[in-house]
UniProtKB/Swiss-Prot annotation:
It catalyses: adenosine(34) in tRNA + H2O + H(+) = inosine(34) in tRNA + NH4(+). Its cofactor is Zn(2+). This is tRNA-specific adenosine deaminase. It comes from Rickettsia felis (strain ATCC VR-1525 / URRWXCal2). Keywords: Hydrolase, Metal-binding, tRNA processing, Zinc. GO terms for molecular function: tRNA-specific adenosine-34 deaminase activity; zinc ion binding. Catalyzes the deamination of adenosine to inosine at the wobble position 34 of tRNA(Arg2). Zn(2+) binds at residues 48, 78, 81.
Length: 144
């Protein structure tokens, strides 16, 4: 999660919403990809940290199935990212801060508990949550 927080810091410095993600090989615990939100620079609403990381990981291993990998993300995934996590079959999801506005894992939609979700990763929340929360708070304080 510390590496995901570093990625969130990079996003913060680029005036992107500070969310970072890393995907880790479960067998050797090595990070295979890391990413951060990039919606402003790319002018594309789809460039969330999770989507970028999943795309890069699939390209790296030449597979759409990431069942031997875990994702660490600093903020509770939105509906789009939760669906991408399910579709790519990541084994475990670790996230930091909850997102009361857009979170779709445990805060609002609860995507993985819905009837439309066909795959549910193991979910672990609250990891370094305060660090993530503070970074988000600073970011939105700065832009308002």
């Amino acid at each position: 999660m510390e590496q995901a927080l570093k990625q969130a810091g990079i996003a913060f410095d680029k005036n992107e919403v500070p969310v970072g993600a890393v995907i880790v090989d479960r067998l050797n615990q090595k990070i295979i990809v890391s990413s951060h939100n990039n919606t402003e620079e790319k002018n594309n609403a789809l460039y969330h940290a999770e989507i970028i990381a999943i795309n890069e990981a699939c390209n790296l291993i030449s597979s759409k199935n990431l069942n031997d990998y875990d994702i660490y993300v600093t903020l509770e995934p939105c509906a789009m990212c939760a669906a991408a996590i399910a579709h790519s079959r990541l084994k475990r999801l670790f996230y930091g801060a909850s997102d009361s506005k857009h979170g779709a894992v445990e805060s609002n939609l609860r995507y993985f508990n819905s009837s439309v979700c066909f795959y549910r990763p193991e979910i672990y929340s609250g990891i370094l949550a305060e660090d993530s929360r503070l970074l988000m708070k600073e970011f939105f304080k700065r832009i308002r």
